[in-house]
């Protein structure tokens, strides 16, 4: 192996914020200390089943062979080859199938063997152990009862530092390739663990003084600046923004990729980091910046992220949510409807792997709830199949929202919004019991204020649909409002129904002001004139499209029948 193993012997070499090695997790409570020591002994001296040893050795050999081949390709000044692609495919099979099956069989609710225990099996291969630890800690976060300890949260952070330093600080491209799915999961899990730690450190009620002191003395562990720095470094190293810019203009992205961006490892990590930044800025409540990081990605065209369905779903979820909070309802509805239709048509392919299905199914349910909110606040036509699903899931709640029930809005928002976080380290000397909820409560207040401003609009819309002309005073009387109050509400209606809407261009922030409201009006002196702008359904277009699809299918079947 030709990677610089000596550089990866100590964690301190990776990160300037290494904690003292003699730190232990003793709490002062004899029962807790005894439980911890038993757990430590069990993990240290556990007997590793023979099948797991064989799997680890095979996994290591596959990764080592790929790295050796990659070194050869780099020395020959080649970017990739069929041999590399085949070995990446083997790793993908191990990662998505073998690892999952063995986890289910041997480690369903318990950790995999520690890296130190399997190190002799892999010749203390530093790079492989970093990759193994990434999977090891991810499994603890996801499946082990009680979740990760404080020490494990810190160790996982250091392991990510090791991994990203290996990729970013190498003299030339790192001799490593991984499946796109694994690369996406690395970025996704990195942000998830940061999010989890941000909430964990705010809940001090059940923490010992020793744990709080340790958190207080290590403010740079899982610091928001470190996380942002990693994501931006991966974006810059890959030159992905420039590649996307050239790609969308019809050019060859390879021409501007640079030394690192030509390699799949850097290109895909850079791309996934853009989506990671979208997610991170959304969690921090900066929706404009969240969408701005995707300014070179054309969401309405099939692109690189289509290769990983979870990345595609995550992208649309956070873009749609950001649009919703920016009061760009028409864009939010378009984004949610598009991705829900995609999930509806491809859902069967996700059931082969449970963890993918669970993640996509959860975001699918959340996006249905967000779409229900958006359509209540801004009624417009969507795909019939999605509309039918929505009525089945949230028909009653949409009726209650139309009547102005704030409790339903709050319930659906709480269920479907991201888990917001604060980037600021709390004051450990005086942490409010609900401090971890403050970011969510702040975003809920912003959303609820907007709902309150539109509370009367649904009722006004239903009245306007009944008439073509009506004295302002008379319609105000129907609503138990004074004429002045009613005129204010009509102005609110005009204002809220006019949205900034994306029409063309690459940046999702671009757009022009439009109104898709099914009813419009103007006031002439004391008389309100109303026009129904609802467009009649064009059934002919639908049937023509279906006929073309049927003819294409018929031609395909005939060709298949002609094959020898």
Curated annotation (Swiss-Prot):
Disulfides per UniProt: none
Protein name: Eukaryotic translation initiation factor 3 subunit L
Gene name of the record: EIF3L
Any one biological process term the GO annotation gives: translational initiation
GO terms under cellular component: cytosol; eukaryotic 43S preinitiation complex; eukaryotic 48S preinitiation complex; eukaryotic translation initiation factor 3 complex; fibrillar center; membrane; nucleoplasm; synapse
Keywords in alphabetical order: Acetylation, Cytoplasm, Initiation factor, Phosphoprotein, Protein biosynthesis
PROSITE patterns according to UniProt: PCI (PS50250)
Molecular-function annotations in GO: RNA binding; translation initiation factor activity
Species: Homo sapiens
Function: Component of the eukaryotic translation initiation factor 3 (eIF-3) complex, which is required for several steps in the initiation of protein synthesis. The eIF-3 complex associates with the 40S ribosome and facilitates the recruitment of eIF-1, eIF-1A, eIF-2:GTP:methionyl-tRNAi and eIF-5 to form the 43S pre-initiation complex (43S PIC). The eIF-3 complex stimulates mRNA recruitment to the 43S PIC and scanning of the mRNA for AUG recognition. (Microbial infection) In case of FCV infection, plays a role in the ribosomal termination-reinitiation event leading to the translation of VP2.
Cited Pfam families: Paf67 (PF10255)
Subcellular location: Cytoplasm
Modified residues (N-acetylserine): 2
């Amino acid at each position: 192996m030709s990677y610089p193993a000596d550089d990866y012997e100590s964690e301190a070499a990776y990160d300037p914020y290494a904690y003292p090695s003699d730190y232990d997790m003793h709490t002062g409570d004899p029962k807790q200390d005894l439980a911890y020591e038993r757990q430590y002994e069990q993990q240290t001296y556990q007997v590793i089943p023979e099948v797991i040893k064989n799997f680890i050795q095979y996994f290591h050999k596959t990764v080592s062979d790929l790295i050796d081949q990659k070194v050869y390709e780099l020395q020959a000044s080649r970017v990739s080859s069929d041999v590399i692609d085949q070995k990446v495919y083997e790793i993908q099979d191990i990662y998505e199938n073998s690892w999952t099956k063995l986890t289910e069989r041997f480690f369903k609710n318990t950790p995999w063997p520690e890296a130190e225990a399997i190190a002799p099996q892999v010749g203390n291969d530093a790079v492989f152990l970093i990759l193994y630890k990434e999977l090891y800690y991810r499994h603890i976060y996801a499946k082990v009862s009680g979740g990760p300890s404080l020490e494990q949260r810190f160790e996982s952070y250091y392991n990510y530092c090791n991994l990203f330093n290996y990729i970013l600080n190498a003299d030339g491209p790192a001799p490593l390739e991984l499946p796109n799915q694994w690369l996406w999961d690395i970025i996704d899990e990195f942000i998830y663990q940061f999010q989890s730690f941000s909430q964990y450190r705010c809940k001090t009620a059940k923490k010992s003084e020793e744990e709080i002191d340790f958190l207080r003395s290590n403010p740079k562990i899982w610091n928001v600046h470190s996380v942002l720095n990693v994501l931006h470094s991966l974006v810059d190293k890959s030159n992905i923004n420039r590649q996307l810019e050239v790609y969308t203009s019809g050019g060859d992205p390879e021409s501007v990729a640079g030394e690192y961006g030509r390699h799949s490892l850097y290109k895909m990590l850079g791309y996934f980091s853009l989506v990671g930044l979208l997610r991170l800025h959304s969690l921090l409540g900066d929706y404009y910046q969240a969408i701005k990081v995707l300014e070179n990605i054309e969401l309405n065209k099939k692109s690189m992220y289509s290769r990983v369905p979870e990345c595609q779903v995550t992208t649309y979820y956070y873009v749609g949510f950001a649009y919703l909070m920016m009061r760009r309802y028409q864009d939010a509805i378009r984004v949610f409807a598009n991705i829900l239709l995609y999930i509806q048509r491809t859902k069967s392919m996700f059931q082969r792997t449970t963890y993918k299905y669970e993640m996509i199914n959860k975001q699918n349910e959340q996006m249905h709830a967000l779409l229900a909110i958006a359509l209540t606040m801004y009624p417009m036509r969507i795909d019939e199949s999605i509309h039918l699903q929505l009525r089945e899931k949230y028909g009653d709640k949409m009726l209650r929202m139309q009547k102005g029930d704030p409790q339903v809005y709050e319930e659906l928002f709480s269920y479907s919004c991201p888990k917001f976080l604060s980037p600021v380290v709390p004051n450990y000397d005086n942490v409010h019991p609900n401090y971890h909820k403050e970011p969510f409560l702040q975003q809920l207040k912003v959303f609820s204020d907007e709902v309150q401003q539109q509370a009367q609009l649904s009722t006004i819309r239903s009245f306007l649909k009944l008439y073509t002309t009506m004295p302002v005073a008379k319609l105000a009387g129907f609503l138990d409002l004074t004429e002045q109050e009613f005129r204010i509400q009509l102005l609110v209606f005009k204002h809220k129904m006019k949205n900034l809407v994306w029409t063309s261009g690459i940046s999702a922030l671009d757009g022009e002001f439009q109104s898709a409201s099914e009813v419009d009006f103007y006031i002439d002196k004391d008389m309100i004139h109303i026009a129904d702008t609802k467009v009649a359904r064009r059934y002919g277009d639908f049937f023509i499209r279906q006929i073309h699809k049927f003819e294409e299918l018929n031609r395909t079947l005939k060709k298949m029948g002609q094959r020898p």
